[in-house]
């Protein structure tokens, strides 16, 4: 079977039962596919179903219409294992938005968070929204960066994703429209090989309310993907990209496997692969790793 459907439920939920698997097989067969055997990647959590004779677009539509209640991702089986991970940081590798947490120390978190939400949904120009939010932090002590970092939590599966891919020879890159203070911390703690982000301009131990130009925007993420794959001697088809915001869309679209992870509505409308139930270990299941293969 040259194609594979991967079904993924929330971790440790035991929500993926034989009934859902049987329904998925029936949906594929009814759409005209030849359906193969089931390979369990994690009991009650993730499995592969091989199939052939059906386009991915038709399979995706049929599975989406079926409303299985789990993540259902189709792809070509032969090329699923990737050699490079390129990941967004905010609301992807970490659960929140680092700029919003920083804004809390200036008493403007709600205002900044509202702008962030609109920008990440593609409703506002990214650079203009970034400048406006950073401008509200003018005069803040740089000591607050460390305080904001204390409020940040890693997304479930983040460390396992990076460690497992690296143990299997992949290169791991963190590329964010956030700030290098935070991406540096994430790189060190999770084991990323590389990080790139925006730079807050400081003077005399205080934020100036400005960010170094040019900003790292959606095009910069695409440029990073192309540069990193070239440096590794591989193609963009050998990369798996993950993000949640509008500024991740081009990167997600270009990578061999592009994942919208618990993403904003506008992003989910355009991305082919969406993960809404699983945590970041879903990206390992998508590549054919079984839970027993995970490096914790």
Where are the regions that the model predicts?
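Alpha-helical substrate-recognition element adjacent to the catalytic core
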Residues: 32-50, 74-80, 92-200, 204-205, ...
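Asp-based phosphoryl-transfer active-site loop
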Residues: 83-98, 247, 252
């Amino acid at each position: 079977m040259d194609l594979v459907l991967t079904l993924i439920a929330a971790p440790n939920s035991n929500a993926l039962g034989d009934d859902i698997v049987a329904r998925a097989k029936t949906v594929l067969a009814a759409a005209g596919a030849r359906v193969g055997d089931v390979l369990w990647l994690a009991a009650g959590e993730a499995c592969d179903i091989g199939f052939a004779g059906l386009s991915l677009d038709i399979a995706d539509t049929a599975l989406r219409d079926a409303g299985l209640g789990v993540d259902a991702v189709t792809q070509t089986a032969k090329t699923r294992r990737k050699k490079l991970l390129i990941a967004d940081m905010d609301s992807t590798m970490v659960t929140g938005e680092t700029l919003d947490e920083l804004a809390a120390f200036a008493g403007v978190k709600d205002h900044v968070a509202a702008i962030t939400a609109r920008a990440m949904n593609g409703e506002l120009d990214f650079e203009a929204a970034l400048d406006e939010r950073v401008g509200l932090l003018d005069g803040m002590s740089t000591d607050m960066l460390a305080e904001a970092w204390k409020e940040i939590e890693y997304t479930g599966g983040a460390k396992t994703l990076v460690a497992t891919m690296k143990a299997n020879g992949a290169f791991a890159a963190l590329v964010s429209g956030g700030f290098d203070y935070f991406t540096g911390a994430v790189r060190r703690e999770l084991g990323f090989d590389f990080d790139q982000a925006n730079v807050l301009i400081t003077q005399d131990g205080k934020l100036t309310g400005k960010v170094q130009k040019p900003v790292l925007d959606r095009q910069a993420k695409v440029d990073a993907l192309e540069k990193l794959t070239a440096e590794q001697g591989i193609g963009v088809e050998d990369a798996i990209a993950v993000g949640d915001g509008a500024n991740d869309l081009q990167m997600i679209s270009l990578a061999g496997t592009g994942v919208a992870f618990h993403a904003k509505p506008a992003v989910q409308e355009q991305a082919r692969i969406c993960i809404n139930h699983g945590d970041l270990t879903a990206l390992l299941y998508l590549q054919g790793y079984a839970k027993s293969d995970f490096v914790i």
